Each structure stands twice: as structure tokens, then as C-alpha cells.
């Protein structure tokens, strides 16, 4: 999976579609990949990441919650730490799934 990711990024596409990119990676490699995504996003590359992981989503600038094929809610990181943003994402995920 790491090789496939590297091959997709080498051409510096305008947009990267990452569907559950950390699903088959261990924690260290997941964090390395997510940090890489943050870095290349700061360089102007757009990344559209599909994930069910609050931790993975916490590396994004903006998170969209999709329900029944429509945008249900969105959050902006706006200077929050990854840890604080992950907590906010988790709370919103719980609400979306009918929790609290």
C-alpha cells in the first residue's frame, strides 16, 4: 500500500483521492502517511480522503460528514491540535450515528 501511495504522489497530481488510505497500515506508518498528506496539502495539493477514522480525519483542514448521500455537517480545524480536532470529530460522528 505504501508503494501504491508513493507512485500516486510522484506525479504531483492536482487532486489526490485517498479512500481509507490508512486501513492496512500500522500506527507508525499511518501517522507518517497522514503527516505527509498534511505537508503536501500545505504545498497546495488537494486531498480528498474518505475515512471512518476520527484520528485520520483530524489531519485535515476541513471534514465533511455525509449522510444519505448529502453533506450532513462540516467542521473546520482552524488552528486546533489534531488531538482536539479528533475529539470534536468523534462527538459529531456519534451524533450522526444517533448517539448523544
Residue locations for each model-derived region?
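Conserved beta-strand-loop-alpha-helix hinge in the C-terminal portion
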Residues: 70-94
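Conserved catalytic segment of ABC-fold P-loop ATPases
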Residues: 59-65
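Conserved H-loop
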Residues: 45-50
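Conserved hydrophobic alpha-helix in the ABC-type ATPase nucleotide-binding domain
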Residues: 33-34
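Conserved signature/switch motifs of ABC ATPase nucleotide-binding domains
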Residues: 11, 43
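Helix N-cap at the start of a conserved alpha-helix in ABC-type nucleotide-binding domains
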Residues: 27-29
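Catalytic Walker B motif of ABC-type/P-loop ATPase nucleotide-binding domains
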Residues: 16-19
Amino acid at each position: 500500500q505504501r508503494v501504491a501511495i508513493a507512485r500516486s504522489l510522484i506525479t504531483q497530481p492536482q487532486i489526490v483521492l485517498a479512500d481509507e488510505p490508512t486501513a492496512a497500515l500500522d500506527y507508525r506508518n499511518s501517522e507518517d502517511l497522514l503527516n505527509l498528506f498534511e505537508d503536501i496539502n500545505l504545498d497546495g495539493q488537494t486531498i480528498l480522503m474518505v475515512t471512518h477514522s476520527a484520528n485520520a480525519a483530524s489531519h485535515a483542514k476541513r471534514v465533511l460528514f455525509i449522510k444519505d448521500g448529502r453533506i450532513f455537517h462540516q467542521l473546520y480545524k482552524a488552528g486546533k491540535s489534531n488531538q482536539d480536532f479528533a475529539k470534536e470529530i468523534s462527538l459529531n460522528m456519534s451524533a450522526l450515528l444517533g448517539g448523544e
